[in-house]
Design a protein with these regions (language model features):
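Conserved MFS/SLC helix-loop-helix module at the cytosolic interface between two early adjacent transmembrane helices
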Residues: 65-99
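Helix-loop boundary and gating motifs at the non-cytosolic
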Residues: 11-61, 224-253, 257-263
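Cytoplasmic helix-loop-helix junction between adjacent transmembrane helices
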Residues: 112-148
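Structural signature of the two symmetry-related core transmembrane helices
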Residues: 82-96, 175, 288-303
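Juxtamembrane intracellular "pre-TM" segments in multi-pass secondary transporters
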Residues: 2-15, 190-228
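Helix-to-loop junctions at the C-terminal end of transmembrane segments
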Residues: 67-79, 162, 274-286, 371
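Residue-level signature of mid-helix packing/kink "hotspots" within the transmembrane helices
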Residues: 61-69, 151-152, 268-276, 360-361
Length: 406
């Protein structure tokens, strides 16, 4: 693995692009949190059943699952900045349409469109930081920290908007947030060489190509890539379970939108601190760090019903969970960025996001039916047991195949 890393080492960091790239991470992650917060509550207002909420949340990942690899390849081919600008504008426009289309089938369509567009902006931000830093874990940790600033303020903003102005204005808040991201991306100078991207774009350049998919899938044979894909799947399955029913569960306990938003914002601070703290973990096994902190994140989510009625314990548990996630993310990004050549950074991010979207599609549906069959509190226990079993399998694999050396 060390040989692979040396072989694909990137050129010097482009520090002039760092501030705007950090800002793109902030707004793209915050954008996702705004959608995570408002859509389940909007669905409850429309009278959706638990299984329907799970399907609605899962639909947000459907197009991304099929087209993330294509989107990453587009960034390699057309330029990351250009693709990010288009999908940032698309996210803002689709968000503004939600209040006018409150029927479940149309909401599913909107979820598919806005899920794809917002995920493409996040793919772009991840690709951009990999290009700008060359896979430096310290600077990627700083990028993750700034990304978490978006997750600190976005839920709080949405909670206040929901309580004070109502759901319609809340969706327009997403549009305003996307406008801020659009401006941030315009400040980034394209880090890709002019001869490495297509100048004039034709409609054929926009179509998915089989070679993009096969080329990306071949990257999964690299041990570093395969392991991080497995960790990323488990991590995103945990977040998908949280996105589906944690907010609904807290609302049922009587918490206001502002209080729920404050809980998420407070926990996001610890997520950012975890990302900044990665630089102090150098020399320790990356594989075991990822497994240990991913498992702790799953366990704390599964135990939510034990803390639900005690807000301060719930806040502490959720904050430690986010701290664990904050440590895992930059380790994962940096390991993958160093494992593949510079010219396919978009493709590797697209592959990782496809993997993540699979988790985001499957988990809400499974948890939706678990909640419907066993009750809301027991649903957390069921999904936690399943995800911890995956972590146990990963730990056995690391020990058996000595993957702790990657």
């Amino acid at each position: 693995m060390a040989d692979e890393t040396k072989k694909t080492e990137a050129p010097a960091q482009q520090t002039s692009n760092l501030p705007a790239t950090y800002a793109s991470g902030l707004f793209s992650m915050g954008q996702a949190e705004l959608l995570t917060f408002v859509v389940p509550l909007w669905a409850v207002l429309q009278g959706a059943e638990p299984a329907e909420i799970g399907i609605l949340v899962g639909a947000r990942s459907a197009l991304t699952f099929f087209l993330a690899i294509h989107g990453g390849a587009l960034m390699d081919r057309l330029g990351t900045r250009r693709v990010m600008l288009f999908f940032t504008a698309m996210t803002g426009l689709v968000a503004a349409a939600y209040p006018f289309l409150p029927w479940l089938p149309l909401m599913i369509v909107l979820q598919m469109l806005i899920g794809f567009a917002s995920n493409m902006t996040w793919i772009g931000a991840q690709t951009m930081i990999a290009l700008v830093t060359g896979g430096d874990a310290g600077r990627i940790g700083t990028f993750s920290f700034y990304s978490r600033i978006g997750t600190i303020f976005a839920p709080l903003l949405m909670g206040v908007l929901w309580d004070v102005a109502g759901p319609q204005i809340s969706f327009l808040g997403i549009t305003a947030w996307s406008s801020c991201m659009f401006f941030a991306v315009t400040r980034i100078e394209n880090p890709q060489k002019a001869d490495a991207v297509i100048g004039k774009v034709s409609w054929r350049d926009l179509l998915p190509k089989l070679s993009d998919y096969t080329g990306s899938l071949k990257l999964a044979v690299l041990p570093a890539v395969a392991f991080t894909l497995a960790i990323s799947f488990t991590r995103h399955a945990t977040n998908a379970a949280e996105s589906s029913f944690l907010i609904v569960y807290l609302k049922e306990l009587g918490y206001t939108g502002t209080l729920i938003g404050s809980l998420f914002s407070f926990a996001a601070i610890f997520n950012g601190l975890g990302s900044l703290g990665v630089r102090f973990l150098r020399g320790l096994s990356t594989a075991w760090l990822m497994i240990g902190f991913t498992a702790s994140s799953i366990l704390l989510l599964a135990l939510t019903p034990l803390f639900g009625s005690m807000f301060f314990l719930l806040a502490a548990s959720h904050s430690i969970r986010r701290l664990s996630e904050g440590i895992v993310q930059p380790l994962m990004f940096a390991l993958q960025a160093r494992a593949v050549p510079r010219e396919v950074q978009g493709s590797i991010v697209g592959l990782r996001v496809t993997n993540n979207r699979l988790a985001s599609i499957v988990t809400p549906v499974i948890m939706g039916y678990a909640v419907q069959w066993f009750g809301l509190a027991n649903g957390f226990y069921v999904i936690g047991a399943l995800l911890l079993a995956i972590c146990a399998w990963l730990a056995i694999s690391v020990a058996k195949f000595e993957l702790d050396r990657i």
